[in-house]
Each structure stands twice: as C-alpha cells, then as structure tokens.
Amino acid sequence: MNLKVKQKIPLKIKRMGINGEGIGFYQKTLVFVPGALKGEDIYCQITSIRRNFVEAKLLKVNKKSKFRIVPSCTIYNECGGCQIMHLHYDKQLEFKTDLLHQALKKFAPAGYENYEIRPTIGMQEPKYYRAKLQFQTRKFKNQVKAGLYAQNSHYLVELKDCLVQDKETQVIANRLAELLTYHQIPITDERKVLGVRTIMVRRARKTGQVQIIIVTNRQLNLTQLVKELVKDFPEVVTVAVNTNTAKTSEIYGEKTEIIWGQESIQEGVLNYEFSLSPRAFYQLNPEQTEVLYSEAVKALDVDKEDHLIDAYCGVGTIGFAFAKKVKTLRGMDIIPEAIEDAKRNAKRMGFDNTHYEAGTAEEIIPRWYKEGYRADALIVDPPRTGLDDKLLDTILTYVPEKMVYISCNVSTLARDLVRLVEVYDLHYIQSVDMFPHTARTEAVVKLIKKV
C-alpha cells in the first residue's frame, strides 16, 4: 500500500457500505468515503490508513449519481445523526436491501444465495418519525445547548429543529435547555464539572403523553425547573432523574427515580395499549413499528395450541400481538422495570396466559425447559450485538418448531444465521425501514425447524 495520509486521489465508487459510506478501490486498496454514492466519480483525500483499507474525505464529486439530492437538513454534514439523507429515498430502501445481501455474502450461512430477500418496506412520509429524543448537553458561554455529538468526536452539535425528530419532543427539549440555563443548573463537561449529562424526551403517539428523563452525575435541585416545565407542557406526565456517575459512554446508570408525576405513559400499537416506564425499551418509530409487528405476526404464523417464548420482551409489546392467538406466552428481559410493565400490561389487558421474568434468555429458557415448559414458537428481538452464544446454544439444543428473528443489525443477523440454519430452514427475510435517512434497517426473518 503506497497511499499516505493527506494524499489526494480520484476514485470510482463501486458500492455503499454498512455505515452508508461510498466504497471504491485505488490500486487494489479498499477506500471508504463518507458522503459518496454508488456510481459516482469523486476526488478525495486520505484521512487514515488501516491494515486492510483506508478512509478518505470527500473533496469533490466529478460525476454525480442521478439519485444524489440536496439534504433538507441545514446541518446534515456537521451532525452525523443521519448518513444517507443525500440519497433519494427510493434508493435508500434499495440500499438497505443490499446491506442484507452484503452481510449474507460476508458470513455465508448455508444456502444464502437462494434466500428470499423481500424489498424493504419504507415510509410514506419519512420525516419527524423519532418519538424518543436523547440529546447530550453542554454549556457554551453560559448557555445550555442540547444535541448530538458529531461523528467520532465529543463536539456537540446543537439540534433545535431536527427533521427526523418528533416535533413535540423537539419543542420540549428546546424549552428544557432554556430552563437549565435560566435556573443555572450545573451541566457536566469533559473536565471536572458535574451535573446534567443527557436529556431524554419520549412521546406516546397514540395518547400524546410525554415522559422525561434527566441524566445526571450529581444530586441536583430541579424542583422549580420541573414546576415550570410541566406548566408549559401539560402533556408531560412523568419526570424522572437517572443517576450515572460512571466515566463511560453508557448513557444511563442503574438508578432511576421519578421526581414528578406518574410511573409510566400509555402507548399503543396494532389494537392494544400498554404502559412504558421511563427506562423501558420501545421502538423509536411508532408508525413503522405497526408494520414491523404485523410482519412478525405474519411470519410466525402461530396457532391456538402453541406455547410461545418472547425473548428480549421489553414491556411485552411484540408478545401481546400473539397473546390471544396462542395457548401460553412467556417472556424475559434484563431490565426489571420493563418486566414489571409487561406484567401490569398483561393484567390490564386481561391476559391470563402470560408469564414474565427478569433475567437473560440464556439463563431463563434452559430453566423453563428443565421445569417442563416446551415452546413451539420463539421470537427474538436482540440488541445490535445479536444473540448471545449461550442463547444460540440453547436454541440449537431445544429447537422450537418455528422462530422469528427480528434484527436491527444485518451483520450480527448474518453471523447468527450461520448457526441457526443448521437446524432451521430460512423461508424469507423482510426488511423494514425503521430509521429513514440513516444506514440502519430492521429485518424480520421467518425460520422453520428442519424436517
């Protein structure tokens, strides 16, 4: 490799990578260029050299893709929260389908060349879709600003009118930053000041209820701030404080205390409502969640005699779509508050065939089997890290008749399929665009036990 940092080179972009970057070859060296699109001829500058590839900065597009558009966001290049807003939305959907093909080719689970990969299901209006806002805070010249860190940095980009963020959550976040400034609430920095680190605002689309978490690494007096905030926004029904003193990139600490209002908000999906406590996980895009869950119901295709396990169940939302269709439903999650929500939700909806426990799937499922419980169907919705090796071992040991894997990371999905297709036939993969203008996608995978 003869390339050097700061060297400027011409490049033909052959494809797009998992983070939305353009990928080309220069003298047989792989080059990654954020902002470049497939089919473009560009001029770029090398920014870093790795063992098997180099990274470069886009300087000029000599031949533009006909699908390149001008992003609507004025700080698109500065923020980094979205990666492919400069690509026409129809082509974004094609790109996300292609990501599945790329991941499968890399990990090569048995028979992947013949998998049915269905076109990605997109949104009618791909904007203002994020019902949950999670912004970092910093103080600049005595003014508190909230936003996201620029990519690969701790430089805060203030966001006051984000095009993918629910409008109401954005308005509340803007006002919260003003109140933090007015009341001179300490804001954490990179050196020695302790105070507010992060603000979270989540809005239930079905009910309009809002909950707020203020993440801090010291005890604060927020009484007057909260009083003014809830006066300005009557839809706020919960304000909580999460204490995180760890010097890590983890946003939340273990302790969350509600300092005003009720324990949870009410949200709805498909034909049922449920409670969400502040720390409980729920999908960020409510509109596409309806699509995702409908696809999961269709793929699992349960019957009334089935016993179903909902791993990574959260507050029970996916499982509730099946509760009236199966004989029994069991779920687990590592967040105890989510399990308590799941129990309350099931009771309120009148389900008497459900059972929930806090803990990991790889620990709980083997115990259930030892106790005599046998699942005919399994649904998994793991984090981006994919399935734990112990859980994979458990699945391969007990092999429920049918399984649906909901993935938010095509790479870990393809990796996990290498083992799963040892015992399952893969019927199809249906991707759903949960995060327009970003390089992320979700996929529903239908698996049936081999005969």
UniProtKB/Swiss-Prot annotation:
Signal peptide interval: none
InterPro entries (UniProt xref): MeTrfase_TrmA_AS (IPR030390), MeTrfase_TrmA_CS (IPR030391), NA-bd_OB-fold (IPR012340), SAM-dependent_MTases_sf (IPR029063), TRAM_dom (IPR002792), U5_MeTrfase_fam (IPR010280)
GO molecular-function term, one example from the UniProt record: metal ion binding
Keyword Protein biosynthesis in record: no
Domain of life: Bacteria
Sequence ranges assigned to domain TRAM in this UniProt record: 2-60
GO biological process assignments: rRNA base methylation
Keywords (A to Z) from UniProt: 4Fe-4S, Iron, Iron-sulfur, Metal-binding, Methyltransferase, S-adenosyl-L-methionine, Transferase
Protein family membership: Belongs to the class I-like SAM-binding methyltransferase superfamily. RNA M5U methyltransferase family.
Designated name of the protein: Uncharacterized RNA methyltransferase spr1717
Lineage: Bacteria, Bacillati, Bacillota, Bacilli, Lactobacillales
